[in-house]
A protein has these predicted regions:
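Pepsin/retropepsin-fold aspartyl endopeptidases
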Residues: 1-63, 68-160
Length: 160
């Protein structure tokens, strides 16, 4: 008398269903992308309420002022040189108002701007001519690309 053992058939069905060891039977879809964790940093304001920070622009470190009143990132001529933008080769054809009057600035795109662990790529910026700006301002062309920023109790929080 012959007894049929269903176990080998069940095992084969499970292997075929899962596609174990059979690459042609696996789903063709790419795996789901990894979930990005939110980056956040908190910056204490100075006694005058301003937020001076160390930033990395195109991987070069500079000092800057976070300025919600500035419509764009504005780099001083000297800082533009430090971060490798070659300001002497730029075209200064954009009129901008500064505390010292109207000057012509050059449009640039920054590959990367980082403040602590908060990073933003492809940031529009302006380079001001030599002597027109004492330091770099990180304005709204940077801040608006963040998921949020807020000032509370003398601390500015940036999230991305």
């Amino acid at each position: 008398m012959r007894i049929n053992n269903p176990l080998p058939s069940v095992a084969l069905a499970v292997l075929l269903t899962l596609g174990a060891g059979l690459p042609g039977l696996r789903p063709a879809a790419d795996p789901a992308p990894a979930v990005s964790l939110m980056a956040m940093t908190e910056i204490k304001g100075g006694q005058n309420g301003h937020y001076f920070i160390s930033a990395a622009i195109n991987t070069h470190s500079i000092k800057a002022l976070l300025d919600t009143g500035a419509s764009a990132v504005a780099l001083s001529y000297e800082d533009a040189d430090t971060v490798g933008l070659h300001p002497h080769n730029l075209t200064y054809d954009v009129g901008v108002s500064t505390a010292n009057g109207v000057v012509k600035a050059a449009r640039v795109r920054l590959d990367r701007v980082e403040v602590d662990n908060v990073r933003v790529d492809n940031v529009d910026a302006l380079v001001l001519p030599e002597g027109a700006l004492n330091g770099t301002l990180l304005g709204m062309s940077f801040l608006s690309k963040l998921s949020s920023f807020k000032s509370e109790n003398g601390t500015l929080t940036l999230k991305n």
